[in-house]
């Protein structure tokens, strides 16, 4: 009897424990459901998923594979633009001028202090004029640029832009990047159909493979919000966290820039950028205001000496300063001593997009090249002109799949201009860098002497660099003309087996520089775009109701 009572008590305890466990589990599920509903009312729950090896914040609507029709129907925007840098601000103004309702979301709307994006080539200025934004270089103390001066081994030569056929106002411009962007933001925000908001976009909202909008943290960073539009254009710059879902990013960092400002001194060649072919890599000087000269020292590799422990200052004084033109030496040392040294990795990334309905990439988020030639803004503004012209015939952007197919033509139409500037930047950087290889040394010397010849030998390359004549065949011709000129210098007047071998290595080295870049850009799209079917895409026809 005792044993039986003990078993009965144990059974009762077990049943009570099981009932308590079941009640706790039901209570947990009920609480979890209430929390989820509360978060959805506030703007949606968030979670993390891995896309292409990178973490991406996704909304509950993305996780469930849909966003409600009410959310989309409730939006009055035609286009969402992520980022209000050069590309984003110019695009917002351009699309709004065409009557689109534009919502711009920018991480930081205060004026930035950057060491790149400070030189706009004449070709880029012409695109500004075409977009109606040329007045944005006014009232920021921007300086006109009429060409470049090259220095190497105590020699120098001046290369002027071929501006004779253009209006007197056409020239390059150099300025503080932050001032220029603020002017463009102000101009875009002055239009009644542009809404510019400070916030951090964390993800794209997708439904069945179509981008419907974005989720973002508001200015205070506490609340999540969502914005919806038929077309989302991502222009969030070189540090883009959204590009992974819209392209295959293959980012290379060949070098870093170390930035200094020299004050109250003029450059030896007024209104010209200065490029010193130093060892191990180039040094740039150009004016960014009436009293300031920007100096950019290229340091190969992904790391620079430490600023904190003085290694970088020591490197600049001992390795770089002796190669600076004498006229700038004292100001260069003074700028180092002042201590306001900034660094920036130089990225390059060929454009390799995924055609995604409802979304598009632009600017440095989409395509980057070495900043040596200052071509980035020219490419971005040229792309914006193309996008504007492609979208102009369209009244409605809601048919995402049809719009996506139509906009595939953009990727082909942009190639001749963008690929020429990209290839020139990558090739010129490699040619201008010092090398222990004798053939590479000969190529570098030949390039300097070829540009010093004048006539077509200087006007052709500088027209390419300026963005005034961005033709792939012209680039190809001049690049190999430099190589052949180098071989000719070796073989004349008395060729020898050693010189012939060196000449062969020079041609081989030149091919090894340019052909991989052309391959990454796409040979067919770059040189023969008219053979690509997307080149001929016509605007979709809107059916009448």
Curated annotation (Swiss-Prot):
Pfam families per record: DAO, SE
Entry EC no(s): 1.14.14.17
Tissue distribution: Weak expression in petioles and flower buds and barely detectable in roots and leaves. In petioles, preferentially observed in vascular bundle tissue (phloem cells and parenchymatous cells near xylem) and resin ducts.
TM helices/strands, residue ranges: 12-32, 475-495, 500-520
Keyword Nucleotide-binding (UniProt): no
GO molecular function, one term: squalene monooxygenase activity
Known cofactor(s): FAD
Superkingdom field: Eukaryota
Topological category with respect to the lipid bilayer: Multi-pass membrane protein
Gene3D superfamilies tied to this protein: FAD/NAD(P)-binding domain
Catalytic activity: squalene + reduced [NADPH--hemoprotein reductase] + O2 = (S)-2,3-epoxysqualene + oxidized [NADPH--hemoprotein reductase] + H2O + H(+)
Function: Component of the triterpene saponins (e.g. ginsenosides or panaxosides) and phytosterols biosynthetic pathways. Catalyzes the first oxygenation step in sterol biosynthesis and is suggested to be one of the rate-limiting enzymes in this pathway.
Protein name per its UniProtKB record: Squalene monooxygenase SE2
Species whose genome carries this gene: Panax ginseng
Annotated gene: SQE2
């Amino acid at each position: 009897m005792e044993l039986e009572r003990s078993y009965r008590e144990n059974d009762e305890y077990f049943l009570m424990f099981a009932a308590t466990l079941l009640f706790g589990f039901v209570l947990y599920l009920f609480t979890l459901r209430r929390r989820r509903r509360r978060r959805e009312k506030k703007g949606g729950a968030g979670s993390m998923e891995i896309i292409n090896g990178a973490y991406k914040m996704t909304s509950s609507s993305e996780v469930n594979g849909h966003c409600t029709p009410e959310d989309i129907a409730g939006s009055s925007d035609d286009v969402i633009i992520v980022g209000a840098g050069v590309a984003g601000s110019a695009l917002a103004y351009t699309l709004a001028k065409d009557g689109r309702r534009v919502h711009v979301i920018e991480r930081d709307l205060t004026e930035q202090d950057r060491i790149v994006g400070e030189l706009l080539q004449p070709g880029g200025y012409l695109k500004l004029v075409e977009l109606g934004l040329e007045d944005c270089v006014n009232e920021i103390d921007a300086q006109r640029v009429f060409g470049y001066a090259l220095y190497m081994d105590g020699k120098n030569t001046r290369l002027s832009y071929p501006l004779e056929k253009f209006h007197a106002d056409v020239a390059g411009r150099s300025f503080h990047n932050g001032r220029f962007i603020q002017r463009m933001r102000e101009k875009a925000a002055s239009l009644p159909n542009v809404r510019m908001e400070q916030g951090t976009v964390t993800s794209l909202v997708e439904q069945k493979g179509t981008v419907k909008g974005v989720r973002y943290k508001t200015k205070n960073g506490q609340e999540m919000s969502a914005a919806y539009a038929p077309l989302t254009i991502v222009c969030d710059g070189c540090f883009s966290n959204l590009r992974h879902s819209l392209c295959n990013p293959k980012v290379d960092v060949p070098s870093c820039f170390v930035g200094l400002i020299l004050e109250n001194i003029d450059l030896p060649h007024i209104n010209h950028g200065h490029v010193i072919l130093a060892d191990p890599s180039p040094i740039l000087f150009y004016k960014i205001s009436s009293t300031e000269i920007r100096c950019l020292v290229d340091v190969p590799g992904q790391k620079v000496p430490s600023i904190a422990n003085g290694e970088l200052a020591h490197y600049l004084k001992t390795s770089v300063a002796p190669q600076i033109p004498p006229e700038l030496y004292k100001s260069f040392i003074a700028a180092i001593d002042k201590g306001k040294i900034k660094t920036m990795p130089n990225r390059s990334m060929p454009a390799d997009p995924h055609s995604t309905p409802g979304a598009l990439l632009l600017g440095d988020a989409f395509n980057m090249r070495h900043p040596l030639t200052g071509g980035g803004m020219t490419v971005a503004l040229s792309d914006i002109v193309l996008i504007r012209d492609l979208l102009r015939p369209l009244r409605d952007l809601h048919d995402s799949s049809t719009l996506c197919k139509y906009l595939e033509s953009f990727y082909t139409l942009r190639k001749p201009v963008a690929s020429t500037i990209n290839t020139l930047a990558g090739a010129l950087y490699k040619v201008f860098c010092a090398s222990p290889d004798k053939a590479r040394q000969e190529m570098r010397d030949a390039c300097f002497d070829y540009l010093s010849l004048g006539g077509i030998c200087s006007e052709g390359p500088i027209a390419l660099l300026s963005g005034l004549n961005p033709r792939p065949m012209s680039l190809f011709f001049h690049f190999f003309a430099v190589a052949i000129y180098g071989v000719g210098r070796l073989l004349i007047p008395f060729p020898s087996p050693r010189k012939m071998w060196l000449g062969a290595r020079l041609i081989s080295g030149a091919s090894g520089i340019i052909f991989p870049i052309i391959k990454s850009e796409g040979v067919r799209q770059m040189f023969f775009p008219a053979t690509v079917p997307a080149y001929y895409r016509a605007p979709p026809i809107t059916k009448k109701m």
